[in-house]
Amino acid sequence: MPTINQLVKKPRTSKVKKSTAPALNKGYNSHKKKATDLASPQKRGVCTRVGTMTPKKPNSALRKYARVRLSNNIEVNAYIPGIGHNLQEHSVVLIRGGRVKDLPGVRYHIVRGALDTSGVDGRMQGRSLYGAKKPKEKK
């Protein structure tokens, strides 16, 4: 327990919270060619590579991911959720924060059903997460 004098000399400092999605906290001023502090919930980007990655130790799969150059000129790896996708190089995508626990270096998710990304076909439950439209009812 510090004394009052110790606290007067050096007050308590609050912990600095590190962002889990740092690329969303930067903007880019193309006129001045400088990075700016402009946080946003999602960012637009262009796919530079689309491929698969194997997860960490106890799991086994081929997880789909895309390397995306964002509108603020930062390149990130983003996970493509859902079964099947239509992404290829030069596709324009929208990314949001959210890491994939068993893929190292993947801190972002691609938003399905936005821009060039199609929704998941035949998805009945949790449709809003995968950009799937409500199916037509049969009479």
Swiss-Prot record:
Region (Disordered): 1-44
SUPFAM superfamilies attached to this UniProt entry: Nucleic acid-binding proteins (SSF50249)
Superkingdom of the source species: Bacteria
PROSITE patterns named among the record's database cross-references: RIBOSOMAL_S12
GO biological process, one term: translation
Keyword Transcription regulation: no
InterPro entries: NA-bd_OB-fold, Ribosomal_uS12, Ribosomal_uS12_bac
Amino acid composition bias (Basic residues), ranges on this chain: 9-18
Family, as annotated: Belongs to the universal ribosomal protein uS12 family.
Subunit and partners: Part of the 30S ribosomal subunit. Contacts proteins S8 and S17. May interact with IF1 in the 30S initiation complex.
Name the UniProt record assigns to this protein: Small ribosomal subunit protein uS12
Natural source organism: Macrococcus caseolyticus (strain JCSC5402)
Gene: rpsL
